[in-house]
C-alpha cells in the first residue's frame, strides 16, 4: 500500500503498516481507523486531500495462521521498507510529521519513550529530532500520538482521555504547520486554530 495525498502537503501523517482493510483497498488509513481519522480531519478543519498519508512499511504484516490478524512489522520488514518512506518524505518536504503509533515513532525519531507514555503525557510533546534517516536541511517538527486503531480500542474501554489528547495533538500539529506556512511562505492561515 503506497502513500497517498497532497505532494505539496505541510503535514505528512505516518503510520506503522497497513492493515487488512488497507491491503484490500490499496489505500492507507481506511476502515474504522480511517473513519476516526476523517473525524479528526474534520475537527482540525482539513481533509485527506490536504495531507500526505503513508506507512513506514507498505505491506500488511499478517499472521498467516490467523486470517485478518495484524502484527507489528519486524525489524527486517522495517529495514526493507523504510528507505521508501524516508525518500517520500524528502520529496514532499513537509514541515510537520504526525506520527501515529510506536512503529512510526521509533522509525522516524530518536525518541526512546513508548507511544503510550507520550500519549499519557498531557503536554503534547514536540519531537524535534525528526531527521533520523532523512536528508533534510531544515529542522522539522514531529508530533506523536496513538494510532487510530489503538484509540478505537481504548475508546471501547471508555478511555476518552486518550482520544481527547490525540485530537489536541492533531490540532497542535496543524497549528505549527500553519504558522510555518505563514512565516516562511507568506501564506494566510490555512488550518483551523
Predicted segments, located by residue:
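A polyanion-binding, active-site-adjacent surface
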Residues: 1-193
Amino acid at each position: 500500500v503506497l502513500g497517498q495525498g497532497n505532494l505539496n502537503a505541510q503535514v505528512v501523517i505516518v503510520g506503522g503498516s497497513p492493515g487488512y482493510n488497507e491491503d484490500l483497498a490499496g489505500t492507507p488509513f481506511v476502515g474504522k481507523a480511517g473513519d476516526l481519522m476523517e473525524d479528526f480531519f474534520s475537527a482540525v478543519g482539513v481533509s485527506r486531500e490536504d495531507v500526505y498519508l503513508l506507512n513506514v512499511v507498505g505491506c500488511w504484516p499478517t499472521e498467516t495462521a490467523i486470517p485478518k490478524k495484524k502484527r507489528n512489522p519486524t525489524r527486517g520488514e522495517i529495514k526493507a521498507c523504510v528507505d521508501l518512506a524516508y525518500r517520500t518524505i524528502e520529496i514532499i518536504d513537509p514541515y510537520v510529521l504526525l506520527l501515529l503509533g510506536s512503529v512510526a515513532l521509533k522509525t522516524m525519531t530518536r525518541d526512546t519513550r513508548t507511544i503510550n507514555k507520550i500519549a499519557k503525557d498531557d503536554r503534547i510533546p514536540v519531537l524535534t529530532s525528526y531527521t533520523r534517516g532523512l536528508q533534510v536541511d531544515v529542522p522539522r517538527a514531529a508530533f506523536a500520538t496513538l494510532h487510530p486503531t489503538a484509540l478505537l480500542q481504548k475508546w471501547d474501554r471508555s478511555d476518552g482521555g486518550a482520544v481527547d489528547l490525540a485530537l489536541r495533538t492533531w490540532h497542535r500539529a496543524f497549528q505549527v504547520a500553519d504558522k510555518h506556512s505563514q512565516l516562511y511562505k507568506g501564506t494566510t492561515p490555512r488550518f483551523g486554530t
